[in-house]
Amino acid sequence: YYYPGGPIFFYLGNEADVTLYVNATGLMWENAPAFGALVVFAEHRYYGKSRVLNNTALQYLSVEQALMDYVTLIDFLQKSYEFDKQKDAVIGFGGSYGGMLASWARMQYPH
């Protein structure tokens, strides 16, 4: 649905495989065409397909690390699609823990 100048609708994955939410998040899909939005579903580290390989890797299972993962992906998308960070919005979506992540991301990374 994306067209230049449209926002990124960014789903912050939570405590399950992100594919469970792709078809259950109608709000994003219903509004994306009207806004020309790029729709992205990002999976949370160590959930879904990305599993913990060993106990030492668990140190990276934190809210702070999850937020940094999402910010890194958003930065990559903004560069890849030549977004104007001053004008083009990133709108976070999520439910349950993912909803809290969306709120925390907005507070910690308002840009």
Describe these PLM feature segments.
Residues Y2-H111:
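Gly/Pro-rich cap/lid or specificity-loop segments adjacent to the active site
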